[in-house]
Amino acid sequence: MSPPLEPHDYIGLSAAAASPTPSSSSCSSSPNPGGEARGPRLTLRLGLPGSESPEREVVAAGLTLGPLPPTTTKAASKRAFPDSSPRHGASSGSVAAAAAACQDKAAPAAAPPAAKAQVVGWPPVRNYRKNTLAASASKGKGEDKGTAEGGPLYVKVSMDGAPYLRKVDLKMYSSYEDLSMALEKMFSCFITGQSGLRKSSNRDRLTNGSKADALQDQEYVLTYEDKDADWMLVGDLPWDLFTTICRKLKIMRGSDAAGIAPRSIEQSGQSR
């Protein structure tokens, strides 16, 4: 009987199987029940290559409706709502009280203010128009009041051929003669040939004389504009009444004033 065949290790496989390699022991990830040190733990992180992020503690958080737990690190935490949720009840009560107070204050202001003056008509008058009308009315009243109280009464004076106008105060004169002499001095450089503006002639005093002939004897005559915008010769009214209705004065040539005559001459001519 032949002896049994025995395996022979020609290439050294039995020795390699008996001694484990260090690479296989280091790469093994199974737990070592003998308490030996395990290999480094591999984790997936976000960052640049070679940078080390701080260690963070893994916290198992469930799905809850309460506030977020306080964060431990600022770098790894996200922005969250401020920790004011426990005071939500108190703050809502204060907000409601403030809103009620604002409504109480706004209630009286909702009523429209009483208008000072109701505008009648259409289209309505703008504010600046109302102010202008009121100012003009008050100015007219002031002028009438000043005239009634004896204030200055200035009127414009113009002359045929004179390039400028003058103003005189009728309250400073007491008669037509004083006014005529004052105007003659003002326009002395334009008046020639006559010593007075309103020097009446014999024909002017006669009621049966022609008014055109009476005016031809004078080089210049003094006329005025009354309240009705009519031009009349000076001297047909009493002086006090003349100062109240005179608006403008004009020194005209006698030939141009042939169609203008005092009211007394016109009335006498119509009566005849």
Curated annotation (Swiss-Prot):
A GO biological process held by the record: regulation of DNA-templated transcription
Tissues where the protein occurs: Highly expressed in roots and flowers. Expressed in shoots.
Gene3D superfamilies named among the record's database cross-references: Phosphatidylinositol 3-kinase Catalytic Subunit, Chain A, domain 1 (3.10.20.90)
Ranges annotated as biased composition (Low complexity): 14-33, 40-50
InterPro entries per record: AUX/IAA_dom, AUX_IAA, PB1-like
Protein localization: Nucleus
Chain spans, region Disordered: 1-92
Sequence motif EAR-like (transcriptional repression), location on chain: 44-48
UniProt induction comment: Not induced by auxin.
Domain PB1: 152-256
Superkingdom of the organism of origin: Eukaryota
Alphabetical UniProt keywords: Auxin signaling pathway, Nucleus, Repressor, Transcription, Transcription regulation
Entry's Gene Ontology cellular component terms: nucleus
Entry annotated with the keyword Signal: no
This protein's record includes keyword Nucleus: yes
Subunit structure: Homodimers and heterodimers.
Sequence similarity: Belongs to the Aux/IAA family.
Physiological role: Aux/IAA proteins are short-lived transcriptional factors that function as repressors of early auxin response genes at low auxin concentrations.
Protein name in the entry: Auxin-responsive protein IAA5
Organism: Oryza sativa subsp. indica
Lineage of origin: Eukaryota, Viridiplantae, Streptophyta, Embryophyta, Tracheophyta
Gene: IAA5
